[in-house]
């Protein structure tokens, strides 16, 4: 009989003692093994786009703490990147994207999307293969408004045009 994952069981209405545990930002500044890998790499975006590194970072907190779920190490800007947007990470400021002035600036070739998203797909496959049968794999996505706030400068100038071009104004 297949053992049900604790998190899935609770989401299906079961009561579990102890309850399943995970943290939304499992990989990050607090783990020494993450900090060591980040220091060697020097680039958050490189880590996101390297399936071997992203797999390792996803699994680090699960191995260390025995969490009931692993959260895939990636970034919400993976999809805008696949759409041809120039993704920029500035130390101390965070991510940004150039303003979109029309939908014409977005990549429409789905083969290019697949190529640019291939590292994310490979990371998902690697993590799934390395997780035990009791550990849930969680993903995430950026909502249109969240992504729209990253287009343009850190001020609201340029965001109105981006929102209009994306059809979310």
Which stretches of residues belong to each language-model region?
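Active-site-proximal, glycine-rich beta->alpha crossover segments in alpha/beta enzymes
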Residues: 88-169
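N-terminal basic, low-complexity leaders that serve as flexible interaction/assembly modules and, when applicable
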Residues: 1-89
């Amino acid at each position: 009989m297949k053992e049900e994952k604790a998190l899935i069981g609770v989401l299906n209405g079961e009561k579990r003692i102890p309850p399943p545990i995970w943290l939304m930002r499992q990989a990050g500044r607090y783990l020494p093994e993450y900090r060591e890998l980040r220091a060697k790499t020097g680039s958050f975006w490189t880590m996101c786009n390297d399936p071997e590194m992203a797999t390792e970072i996803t699994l680090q907190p699960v191995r260390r703490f025995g969490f009931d779920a692993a959260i895939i190490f990636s970034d919400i800007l993976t999809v805008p990147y696949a759409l041809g947007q120039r993704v920029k990470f500035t130390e101390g400021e965070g991510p940004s994207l150039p303003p979109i002035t029309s939908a014409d600036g977005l990549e429409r070739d789905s083969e290019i999307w697949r190529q640019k998203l291939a590292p994310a797909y490979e990371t998902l496959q690697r993590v799934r293969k390395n997780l035990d049968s009791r550990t849930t794999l969680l993903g995430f996505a950026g909502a249109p408004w969240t992504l729209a706030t990253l287009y343009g400068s850190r001020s609201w100038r340029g965001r109105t045009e981006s929102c209009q071009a994306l059809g979310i104004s």
